[in-house]
């Protein structure tokens, strides 16, 4: 049986009088990719921030069976990494130096830091940018660079790793969208990493995820495999949009089209 990486029970977040997350129960397991889906304002990014400890809220949250409150921040940083949505932060560093920031919790020798950073830069297709200054990079290059940084951070966690991706494909071209999600899929399949990703593209989610978790008005309305989650009726319920759902012509996952 797959190890439970994260378990949240009765999770709630309120902004003023608005209930952003409404008594959410969620379980994420090692070796699987789970996609958080839903319209703008459904609570996807809020749930991700709550799960990673960036935001406080009500309810119970465990990492690998241990209450979140019992994890020292330094230890949790070795096991949980998050790639946030793009920010306006900048660094007066080279691309490789930015990736090496991920090794700060690891206390590795300098040569090993360089080796690990370059290993993940190669995986995310930014190694050729190693000497480039961070401010000179495009939005998509920065996104891939920060993914390499997060993977560097998790390098020593073995099979107790949680990778959280908040709209990781938003600034990427078609090829790098698929490359990024293929890498997430590979980490889950080959290294038993638990991956949770916020996406807007239902077709990408169906192609690369084991589970689709659909949120609507702060509640989980469906948590199921792609074929069970993506029905025309549910898409209209969640998005208010009439769609057709059909099989991919050569692979076993559903595709969503305009009705």
Curated annotation (Swiss-Prot):
Residue numbers binding ATP: 38-45
UniProt-listed PROSITE patterns: ABC_TRANSPORTER_2, HMUV
SUPFAM superfamilies from the UniProt entry: P-loop containing nucleoside triphosphate hydrolases
Cellular component, GO annotation: plasma membrane
Chief location: membrane
Ribonucleoprotein found in the keyword field: no
InterPro entries attached to this UniProt entry: AAA+_ATPase, ABC_transporter-like_ATP-bd, P-loop_NTPase
Keyword Cytoplasm: no
Highest taxon of the lineage: Bacteria
E.C. number(s) listed in UniProt: 7.6.2.-
Keywords: ATP-binding, Cell inner membrane, Cell membrane, Membrane, Nucleotide-binding, Translocase, Transport
Disulfide bonds, paired cysteine numbers: none
GO MF term (any one): ATP hydrolysis activity
Subcellular location: Cell inner membrane
Membrane topology reported for the UniProt record: Peripheral membrane protein
CDD domains: ABC_Iron-Siderophores_B12_Hemin (cd03214)
Domain ABC transporter: 6-242
Record note on quaternary structure: The complex is composed of two ATP-binding proteins (HmuV), two transmembrane proteins (HmuU) and a solute-binding protein (HmuT).
Function of the molecule: Part of the ABC transporter complex HmuTUV involved in hemin import. Responsible for energy coupling to the transport system.
UniProt record similarity statement: Belongs to the ABC transporter superfamily. Heme (hemin) importer (TC 3.A.1.14.5) family.
Protein name as it appears in the record: Hemin import ATP-binding protein HmuV
Species classification: Bacteria, Pseudomonadati, Pseudomonadota, Gammaproteobacteria, Vibrionales
Gene: hmuV
């Amino acid at each position: 049986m797959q190890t439970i990486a994260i378990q949240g029970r009765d999770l709630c977040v309120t902004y003023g009088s608005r209930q952003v997350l409404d008594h959410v129960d969620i379980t994420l397991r090692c070796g699987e990719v789970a996609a958080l889906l839903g319209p703008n304002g459904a609570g996807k990014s809020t749930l991700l921030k709550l799960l990673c400890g960036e935001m406080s809220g009500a309810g119970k949250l465990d990492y690998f069976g241990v209450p979140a409150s019992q994890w020292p921040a330094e230890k949790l940083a070795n096991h949980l990494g998050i790639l946030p949505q793009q920010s306006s932060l900048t660094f007066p560093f080279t691309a490789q130096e930015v990736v090496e920031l991920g090794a700060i919790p690891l206390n590795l020798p300098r040569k090993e830091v360089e080796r690990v950073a370059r290993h993940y830069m190669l995986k995310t297709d930014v190694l050729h940018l190693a000497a480039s200054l961070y401010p000179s990079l495009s939005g998509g290059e920065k996104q891939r660079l920060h993914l390499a940084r997060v993977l560097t951070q998790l390098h020593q966690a073995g099979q107790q790793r949680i990778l959280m991706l908040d709209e990781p494909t938003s600034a990427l071209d078609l090829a790098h969208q698929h490359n990024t999600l293929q890498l997430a899929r590979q980490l889950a399949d080959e290294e038993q990493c638990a991956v949770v990703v916020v996406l807007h593209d239902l077709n990408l989610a169906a192609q690369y995820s084991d589970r689709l978790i659909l949120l609507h008005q702060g509640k989980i309305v469906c948590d199921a495999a792609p074929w069970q989650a993506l029905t025309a009726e549910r898409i209209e319920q969640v998005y208010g949009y009439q769609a057709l759902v059909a099989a991919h012509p050569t692979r076993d996952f559903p595709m969503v089209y305009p009705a």
